[in-house]
Structure formats: structure tokens, C-alpha cells
UniProtKB/Swiss-Prot annotation:
The gene is STK. A lipid is attached at residue 2 (N-myristoyl glycine). This is Tyrosine-protein kinase STK. PANTHER family: TYROSINE-PROTEIN KINASE. It comes from Hydra vulgaris (Hydra). It catalyses: L-tyrosyl-[protein] + ATP = O-phospho-L-tyrosyl-[protein] + ADP + H(+). One of its GO terms (molecular function) is ATP binding. The modification Phosphotyrosine is found at residue 390. SMART domains: SH2, SH3, TyrKc. Residues 240-495 form the Protein kinase domain. It comes from the Eukaryota.
Length: 509
């Protein structure tokens, strides 16, 4: 959710205990679990949630509105429909709030990312918050959306201002929405408005200088929930149904499955002996806290015995390697390919900021979802592998062609060795999954790279893009760019934030 919601929520959590207030539905010694859904597993909730403190229901905002439909995954959950009004009762768990529906009067846990404060901009379908211009264009150009599809986002360069992005046939036009000193907003000074609501309403009725009238708020993707359910981390194997094998690698298999008969998931099964269960548990505890829109969300684990199961969100497009080499991505053009690389850089920039190292960044470890969404998978697992064929750089399983020389030869894995691997990943993307250093063995590759050899420019690769790759392959790790830099330069590869904003009445161009 946007920052508005998070600030309000923080304030609400600091409210004094209102457990006996008339605004609170829960009463002492009353179980909050009024729902009882058949065929849905309980996840060890034998007690009501702790409601002392924090409680909502005082002078702060307690009424939120649902942004998406949600179907209960466990018996303690609350199902709701988009637009439904909910009273938030408890936010002690940041990911799963306890709420009451003002329509059904039922209570239960809800994913906090599915709701926003009532009458806030975050609750509007057309408000996209911190989405950048390039991301706005990608969303608005999804196939099938009509002209006039629009969104409002925060301005990237002017704090307090906004941008209106509108689809116009095969292009997107952007308008600056400036803030008045009196608190209102305007695109042109001849038509000021008290709020963004009034601005949207006006330009929905009449183009009044825009390329066209506003017709449809840009569709939003459902966010990933913070975990699969409240307190569901170490889950019973019996709660998983493995339906279809998606692939098999050196260390196990990946399956499409269903958890608890309610939720589609992906399940990675690790071959016995691949890694220590105890070490994995420690690492998984860190991994589950790493959350970003371009990281695959770790939902749950089964580590009571081998094989270890890793349960994650399901990505319909499979691995980026397969997607580009033999899937729907074989005909993708350069702008989409560069956008995919930018998404990976975004996820890695988050890991960089957290001081976390991937160690095995490659197209096979990037997963693809709807609308070309890319997410980094398997971050951190490489460090735990106990197979000599993998851990020794001359081993048959070691990914020499993706690994920086200082990491391959001296085991010096850093975020800068990940940057080197990202350059190889960029080459994979441009060549639609071609194996790096074609025609060279692993031994030849490491020997030649040490001498200064770098892959030559690939067919169809623009020179500026190749120059970015060369920066990532700098022999000195400290002279390689950061992922934050790579994200920015790739996101802006085709777009300059200083150009392309329009004034009302400007001729189409």
C-alpha cells in the first residue's frame, strides 16, 4: 500500500486499548473465529488474536475498502469482494490484519496489501502512487486496453505533484498535474480543481484539451500476500498437492501445486543431501523477510524431513530461459527485453540495499509471470549447497560461464560478482537464451576471461546496451556499476523523464 496508508496504520497501532469501546465488535472471552469453511485447514490458531494492544476503533481511521477480491485460504481468514468496506480491528501482524466486514458482519484475517483507507487516493482504481513513467507506459500499453485508459501517479521530479498518463492508440501521453498553493490541482490554469477526484471526473466527461477523454482506470495486478496465510510457515506436506512438474534441475524438481485446496503455489523439492536442513532453516528465515515486487515471494517450507520443500508464489511463464528460448518470449522485441532486464535489476537493487548476495544469477533463476513480469528466484540458496560438483569451480555443476572470475577462482562472492552475472544474464536476454561464450568449454572460458577476453557484441544488440554489459564485466569488482545504477539506466533506456510531458491542446506528436 501507499505511504498514506502506512503512516495512518502506524498511528493507529499507537492508539490506547479500546477493547471495551462500542466501536469494537470483539468482546472479552468471545472467539473471533466466526467463519467455518469446509475443507480448509486450521493452522494452529486455538486462541483469539491478542487484542491488547494494539486496537483500532478510536479517533483514527479504522474503515478501509477492499481493492481486490479475496477468498479465504484458511478457516480464520475473511473472504471479501472488491469495494467491500471493512473495519480494521487489529494490525499487530503487519501482513495479516484482523477485520470485520461491514456487509456480512463476519470477522477474520485479511491480507493488508489488499485494502486501503476509505476515501484515500490509495483506494482509487486510477491511483498508482510511486509507479514510474516507464512502468506506467508498460501497464497502459497492455493489449486490449482502449484509448483513454489512464492512471495518476506521483511525479518523479516534483514532490507533491502528480502525473496523468493516458493511452492514446498506440502511444501514451503524459500530463503534469501541478498543486495549487491553496491545495487544489490543475493541468491548465484555466481549469483548477479542489482534488484529484474532481480532476478525474471532469476529464472523464470531456477531453477539454487532453488527447481524449478518460475512459477506464488502468487495471491493477493483485499484489502478492505477505506469506501464504497468517502464521503458516512450516506447513504439513499433506497440505500440498503437487499437480504438474514444471522442470527438473541439478538439485531437485519444481512443481505446480495447490496448498490447502485453496491457493496455487510452486513447490521446489530439493534432492536429499543437497544442503543441511538446519542451515536451510536459518537461511529461509532471512529469505522470507526479503520482499519486493521483483523477487519471488517465499511462502512456506517443509523441513521436517528430506526432501525439503520450498513453497513460493506461482509464476505462470516459468523460467526466463525457457520463456525466451522456446516459450511465448521467442518473438519479443528489444524494448520488452530491456524492460525485463530492468525488472531484474530492480529486484537485485533491493537485495543490494539489504546487503544480500544472490550467488547464482542467471536466466534459469528468473521467473516470468503475466504481462512480462520478471522476478528473481533462488536468491541465497547457492551458498548452502553441499555438492562438491557445484562448490568446486572445476566441478561439472558449477556455473562458470555466469560467475565472476574472483568468485570462480577465489570464492570471493559479493554483490559485485552478482553484477558480473547480471551482465551475462543481459546477454542471455538479448540472444533469447543462447548459452554464454558459445563454442567454449568451461575451462576455456575461465582461462580466456582471466586474460581479458569478453564476449563480443551479440547480433541485434545495440552498442549502448553492449557497453552496459562491458561495465558489468570490469576486471576490478569495485569499478562495476551498482544495481541501483543499472536499474535506472535500463528503465530510462528509451525514456527521458525530462521530455514528453504535454500541455493541454498540444498537437499530437
Amino acid at each position: 500500500m501507499g505511504p498514506c496508508c502506512s503512516k495512518q496504520t502506524k498511528a493507529l497501532n499507537n492508539q490506547p486499548d479500546k477493547s471495551k469501546s462500542k466501536d469494537v465488535v470483539l468482546k472479552e472471552n468471545t472467539s473471533p473465529f466466526s467463519q467455518n469453511t469446509n475443507n480448509i485447514m486450521h493452522v494452529s490458531h486455538n486462541q483469539p488474536p491478542n487484542i491488547n494492544p494494539p486496537m483500532l476503533g478510536g479517533p483514527g481511521v479504522t474503515i478501509f475498502v477492499a481493492l481486490y477480491d479475496y477468498e479465504a485460504r484458511i478457516s480464520e481468514d475473511l473472504s471479501f469482494k472488491k469495494g467491500e468496506r471493512l473495519q480494521i480491528i487489529n494490525t499487530a501482524d503487519g501482513d495479516w490484519w484482523y477485520a470485520r466486514s461491514l456487509i456480512t458482519n463476519s470477522e477474520g484475517y485479511i491480507p493488508s496489501t489488499y485494502v486501503a483507507p476509505e476515501k484515500s487516493y490509495e483506494a482509487e482504481e486510477w491511483y498508482f502512487g510511486d509507479v514510474k513513467r516507464a512502468e506506467a507506459e508498460k501497464r497502459l500499453m497492455v493489449r486490449g486496453l482502449p484509448s483513454g485508459t489512464f492512471l495518476i501517479r506521483k511525479a518523479e521530479t516534483a514532490v507533491g505533484n502528480f502525473s496523468l498518463s493516458v493511452r492514446d492508440g498506440d502511444s501514451v501521453k503524459h500530463y503534469r498535474v501541478r498543486k495549487l498553493d491553496t491545495g487544489g490541482y490543475f493541468i491548465t490554469t484555466r481549469a483548477p480543481f479542489n482534488s484529484l477526484y474532481e480532476l478525474v471526473q471532469h476529464y472523464t466527461k470531456d477531453a477539454d484539451g487532453l488527447v481524449c477523454a478518460l475512459t477506464l482506470p488502468c487495471p491493477k495486478d493483485k499484489p502478492v500476500t505477505g506469506g501464504i496465510a497468517k502464521d503458516a510457515w512450516e506447513i504439513p506436506r499433506e497440505s500440498l498437492r503437487l499437480n504438474r512438474k514444471l522442470g527438473a534441475g541439478q538439485f531437485g524438481e519444481v512443481w505446480a501445486g495447490v496448498w490447502n485446496n485453496t491457493t496455487q503455489v510452486a513447490v521446489k523439492t530439493l534432492k536429499p543431501g543437497t544442503m543441511s536442513p538446519a542451515s536451510f532453516l536459518d537461511e529461509a528465515g532471512v529469505m522470507k523477510k526479503l520482499r519486493h515486487k521483483h523477487l519471488v515471494q517465499l511462502y512456506a517450507i517443509c523441513s521436517d524431513r528430506e526432501p525439503i520443500y520450498i513453497v513460493t508464489e506461482y509464476m505462470s511463464g516459468g523460467s526466463l530461459l525457457d520463456y525466451l528460448s522456446k516459450g511465448e518470449g521467442v518473438n519479443l522485441q528489444l524494448p520488452t527485453l530491456i524492460d525485463m532486464a530492468a525488472q531484474v535489476a530492480s529486484g537485485m537493487a533491493f537485495l543490494e540495499a539489504q546487503g544480500y548476495i544472490h550467488r547464482d544469477l542467471a536466466a534459469r533463476n528468473i521467473l516470468v509471470g503475466e504481462n512480462y513480469i520478471c522476478k528473481v528466484a533462488d536468491f541465497g540458496l547457492a551458498r548452502l549447497i553441499e555438492d562438491d560438483e557445484y562448490t568446486a569451480h572445476e566441478g561439472a555443476k558449477f556455473p562458470i560461464k555466469w560467475t565472476a572470475p574472483e568468485a570462480a577462482l577465489y570464492n570471493r562472492f559479493t554483490i559485485k560478482s552478482d553484477v558480473w552475472s547480471f551482465g551475462i544474464l543481459m546477454a542471455e536476454i538479448v540472444t533469447k537464451g543462447r548459452i554464454p561464450y558459445p563454442g567454449m568449454t568451461n575451462a576455456q572460458t575461465i582461462a580466456e576471461v582471466e586474460k581479458g577476453y569478453r564476449m563480443p557484441i551479440m547480433p541485434g544488440c545495440p552498442e549502448p546496451l553492449y557497453n552496459i554489459m562491458l561495465q558489468t564485466w570490469n576486471k576490478d569488482p569495485e569499478n562495476r556499476p551498482t544495481f541501483d545504477y543499472l536499474q535506472g539506466v535500463l528503465e530510462d533506456y528509451f525514456v527521458s523523464t525530462e521530455q514528453g510531458y504535454r500541455d493541454l491542446g498540444e498537437a499530437n506528436s
